[in-house]
């Protein structure tokens, strides 16, 4: 895993949740972990990792993920045993 992806993962697990994580960095992290990122209708995205799916909407007009999305990702990664 590249240092950029490691920093993104550490930011997701930081407490309290940060709302300054760029959504495209999250997409890159999922791909670096061997997952798949698919864009659905509108701004909906499907993240697939280790046989599990997570649905999120790309924030707009901002490019940063919202805090609740970061918290959901943290819980999903924790369930999949993906940790920094």
Give the location of each predicted region:
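Basic nucleic-acid-binding interfaces
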Residues: 1-84
